[in-house]
Amino acid sequence: MQEEKSAVYDFGVALLRLLNYEGDNTMIRQRKEMSFMMGGKKVDAEADLTIVDDNYCYLVVQENKRIGSPDDPKAQLIAESIAAFHLNAIRRRYEGNLPPLERQVIPGITMVGTSPIFYRTTVTRSLLNNLSSLQYPSEETVVLRVGMTTVENRRIVLQCFEAFKPLLVCGRLC
């Protein structure tokens, strides 16, 4: 089973590198550990793959590693997006003269087999505070999702990966 997980990670890394997601100042990390507070307790969220630089996390990728599994990696991806926002907010606070991070669009990808689904999750300071105190969020959390369902659309999938790349620039704290 560990070998299968490794192959899934390797495929994801190879695909992101092939499409130039890794740049001069960014790198692909596997199994990035992040966390946030929920109900006064630390919640861990380990992303399968992330695009990071020295300070920030820009993209999270969650893979469903069990072939034929009905598990949907969407909930895990959203938790990782919240944890990435929390990490980015903490790091931004220590950078100096920057205003606090109030909201950020976190791009994400889930992979079920070789089929990607692309996400844009808007995470806010308010959502983080509500989760920390177990209060129902006072504002709507927007999660946009676009996916491919047929294997014949591989060319289109690669075009989606290319089109998705500019979100990394926007995701860098806009």
Q: Model-predicted segments: where are they?
A:
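Charge-rich, low-complexity intrinsically disordered linkers/tails
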Residues: 1-72, 149-174
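Generic detector of low-complexity/intrinsically disordered segments
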Residues: 130-136, 146, 160, 169-170
